[in-house]
C-alpha cells in the first residue's frame, strides 16, 4: 500500500515538473530562430520590442520625411498646381496603403512576417535612394523658375522621381501589414499576463510611429525648406538603412509564427463551394458525397467556413475607416495649403506650413502615455475590462474627434477668408495676417483622433482575425487609408469641376476660393459616418476561430 502511495506521489511530482517545464516555453505555436519552441525567459515579450520599436520609428521617420512635405516639393520644385500636386500626393499615399495586400499575402502564405519585412525593406531603401538622386542630380530635376516661367519636369525626370516614390510604396507594403502583427506575435496569447502586455504593446507601437513622424514634421521639414531637398531626402534614406539594421539586430530574441498557407485560396474555396451548393438539393443518402471528401473546392472544413464568416462580419467596421481616412488625409494636403496662406513669421524666422504637422504627432506623444497610464486604469474601474475601453469604443471616440478637427479647420478658414476680403487680398493672393498657430487645434485634435481610432483598429483586426489571416487582415484594415485617399482625391476633382468659376479649391490662389465649404463637406461626411459605425458596432458579435 505504501509503495502505491509513493508511486502516485512520484507521478504527481513528475507531472508537476512537466507542467512547470511547459510553462517555460511559449505555447502559441511560435518557434525561435532555431526552429524550437521559444523559451519565454530569453525570447519575445518586452525584450524583443525595443528592436521592433526602433525599426518602426526609423522607418516612419523615413516615410513621413517624404510624405509630410511632398506636396510642397511638387508645387515648388516640380512646378505643379495645387490641385495636381494634391492628386499626386493622395494617389501615392493611397498606393502606399494598397501594396500591403501584396506583402500580407506573401507573409501569411509563403515567407512569414520576418522575411517579408526583411526583403521589402531592401526594396524600400532602393526607392529612397532613387528619390534622393532625383532631388540631387541637376539633370534629374526641373530647372528653377525664371520670373513667371517655370519649366515642367521632363519624361526622364518624372520617371526617376515616380520610380523612387512607387518603389517606396511597394517596400512599405511588406512592412506595414507585418510589423505590428510581428510585434504582437512576441506575446504568448495563451499566457494571461502576456495578453495584458500585448494590449499595452499596441499603444506604445503607435507611440514610436509618432516619434518618427514628429522628427519629420519638425527637423526634416525645416531642413527641406531651408537647406534644400537634397539633404532633406538624404536624411530619411539614412534612417531607412538604420531601420533595417535595427530589425536584424533583434533576430535572436524574436518569436516566429510559421506561414499557414494562402488565406486567399482558403476564402476562394469556401465561396466556390458555397456557390456550387447553392442550388443543390439535399441528397437522400447523406453518406454519398462523391469526390467532395477530397476536393476542397467542393467541400471545405468548418474552420474555413467560420473564418470567412468572421471576415464578412468585419466588413461594416472596416468600411467606417474609409471616411475617417478622408478626413485624416487633409493634414498632409489642404491643411498645409491653408497654412501656406497664413502669417508664418516669428521675427525673422519663417515657419514652414508642413511643420504644423508636429502638433498632430505631439498630441499622440502626449496622449498615449496619458491614455495607457491614467485613462485605462480609471476607465477599468467602471468597465471591468483590463484594457479599459473595447477596441470598437476606441474607434468610435476617434471618429467623433476627427469631425471636431475638421470643424475647427472650417471655422479657421471661414475667418481667414473673411479677413482676406476685408483687407482686399482676394485677387492678389497675398498672405492673410492670421497667425498660422490658429491651426494648432485642428492638428492636435486629429492626432488625438488617431490615438483612439488607429490603435483601436490595429488591435481590433489583430484580435478578431483568424490566426492564419493576421497579416492579411492588417493589410485589409490599412486598405481603408488607400480608399480614403483615393476618395479624397476624387472629391477634390469633383468639387473643382462642379464648382466651376467659383472653384472651392483654386489652382493657385485659395484666397479666391472656398476651402471652408470643402471642410464643411467633410464634416458632414464624418457626421453621417458616426451613427452608421455605432449601429454596426452594437450588432457586431466578438468571436475567435
Curated annotation (Swiss-Prot):
Q: Please give the Pfam families that the UniProt record associates with this protein.
A: PTR2 (PF00854)
Q: Where in the cell is it found?
A: Membrane
User: Which InterPro entries does the UniProt entry name for this protein?
Assistant: MFS_trans_sf (IPR036259), POT_fam (IPR000109), PTR2_symporter_CS (IPR018456)
Residues with Phosphothreonine modification? 116
Q: Write out the entry's keywords from A to Z.
A: Membrane, Phosphoprotein, Transmembrane, Transmembrane helix, Transport
PROSITE patterns the record matches: PTR2_1 (PS01022), PTR2_2 (PS01023)
Task: Write one Gene Ontology MF term.
Answer: transmembrane transporter activity
Gene Ontology biological process terms from the UniProt entry: oligopeptide transport
What is known about the tissue distribution of this protein? Answer: Expressed in roots.
**What does UniProt give as GO cellular component?**
plant-type vacuole membrane
What sections of the protein cross the membrane? 89-109, 117-137, 155-175, 201-221, 231-251, 315-335, 346-366, 395-415, 436-456, 475-495, 518-538
Q: How does it sit in the membrane?
A: Multi-pass membrane protein
The UniProt family comment states: Belongs to the major facilitator superfamily. Proton-dependent oligopeptide transporter (POT/PTR) (TC 2.A.17) family.
Protein name (database record): Protein NRT1/ PTR FAMILY 8.4
- Which source organism? Arabidopsis thaliana
Amino acid at each position: 500500500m505504501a509503495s502505491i502511495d509513493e508511486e502516485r506521489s512520484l507521478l504527481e511530482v513528475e507531472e508537476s515538473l512537466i507542467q512547470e517545464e511547459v510553462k517555460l516555453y511559449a505555447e502559441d505555436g511560435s518557434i525561435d530562430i532555431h526552429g524550437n519552441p521559444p523559451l519565454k525567459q530569453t525570447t519575445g515579450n518586452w525584450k524583443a520590442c525595443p528592436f521592433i520599436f526602433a525599426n518602426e520609428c526609423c522607418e516612419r521617420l523615413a516615410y513621413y520625411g517624404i510624405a509630410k512635405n511632398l506636396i510642397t516639393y511638387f508645387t515648388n520644385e516640380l512646378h505643379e498646381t495645387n490641385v495636381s500636386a494634391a492628386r499626386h500626393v493622395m494617389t501615392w499615399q493611397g498606393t502606399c496603403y494598397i501594396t500591403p495586400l501584396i506583402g500580407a499575402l506573401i507573409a501569411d502564405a509563403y515567407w512569414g512576417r520576418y522575411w517579408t519585412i526583411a526583403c521589402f525593406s531592401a526594396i524600400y531603401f532602393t526607392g529612397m535612394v532613387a528619390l534622393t538622386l532625383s532631388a540631387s542630380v541637376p539633370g534629374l530635376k526641373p530647372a528653377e523658375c525664371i520670373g513667371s516661367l517655370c519649366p515642367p519636369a521632363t519624361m526622364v525626370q518624372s520617371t526617376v522621381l515616380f520610380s523612387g516614390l512607387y518603389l517606396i510604396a511597394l517596400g512599405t507594403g511588406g512592412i506595414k501589414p507585418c510589423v505590428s502583427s510581428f510585434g504582437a506575435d512576441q506575446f504568448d496569447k495563451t499566457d494571461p499576463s502576456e495578453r495584458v502586455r500585448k494590449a499595452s504593446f499596441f499603444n506604445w507601437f503607435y507611440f514610436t510611429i509618432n516619434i518618427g513622424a514628429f522628427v519629420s514634421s519638425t527637423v526634416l521639414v525645416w531642413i527641406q525648406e531651408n537647406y534644400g531637398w537634397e539633404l532633406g531626402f538624404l536624411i530619411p534614406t539614412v534612417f531607412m538603412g538604420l531601420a533595417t539594421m535595427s530589425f536584424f539586430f533583434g533576430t535572436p530574441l524574436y518569436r516566429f509564427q510559421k506561414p499557414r498557407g494562402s488565406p486567399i485560396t482558403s476564402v476562394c474555396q469556401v465561396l466556390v463551394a458555397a456557390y456550387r451548393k447553392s442550388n443543390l438539393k439535399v441528397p437522400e443518402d447523406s453518406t454519398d458525397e462523391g469526390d467532395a471528401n477530397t476536393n476542397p473546392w467542393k467541400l471545405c472544413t468548418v474552420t474555413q467556413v467560420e473564418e470567412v464568416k468572421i471576415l464578412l462580419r468585419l466588413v461594416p467596421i472596416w468600411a467606417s475607416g474609409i471616411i475617417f481616412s478622408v478626413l485624416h488625409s487633409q493634414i498632409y494636403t489642404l491643411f498645409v495649403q491653408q497654412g501656406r496662406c497664413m502669417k508664418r513669421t516669428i521675427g525673422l524666422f519663417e515657419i514652414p506650413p508642413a511643420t504644423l504637422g508636429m502638433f498632430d504627432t505631439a498630441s499622440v506623444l502626449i496622449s498615449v502615455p496619458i491614455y495607457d497610464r491614467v485613462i485605462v486604469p480609471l476607465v477599468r474601474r467602471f468597465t471591468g475590462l483590463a484594457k479599459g475601453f473595447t477596441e470598437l469604443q476606441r474607434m468610435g471616440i476617434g471618429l467623433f474627434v476627427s469631425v471636431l478637427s475638421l470643424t475647427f479647420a472650417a471655422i479657421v478658414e471661414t475667418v481667414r477668408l473673411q479677413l482676406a476680403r476685408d483687407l482686399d487680398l482676394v485677387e492678389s493672393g497675398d498672405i492673410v495676417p492670421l497667425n498660422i498657430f490658429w491651426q494648432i487645434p485642428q492638428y492636435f485634435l486629429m492626432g488625438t483622433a488617431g490615438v483612439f481610432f488607429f490603435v483601436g483598429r490595429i488591435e481590433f483586426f489583430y484580435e478578431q482575425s483568424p490566426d492564419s489571416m493576421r497579416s492579411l487582415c492588417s493589410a485589409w484594415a490599412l486598405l481603408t487609408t488607400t480608399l480614403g485617399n483615393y476618395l479624397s482625391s476624387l472629391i477634390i476633382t469633383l468639387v473643382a469641376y462642379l464648382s466651376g468659376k467659383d472653384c472651392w479649391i483654386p489652382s493657385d490662389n485659395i484666397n479666391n476660393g472656398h476651402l471652408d465649404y470643402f471642410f464643411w463637406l467633410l464634416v458632414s461626411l464624418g457626421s453621417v459616418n458616426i451613427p452608421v459605425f455605432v449601429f454596426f458596432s452594437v450588432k457586431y458579435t466578438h468571436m475567435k476561430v
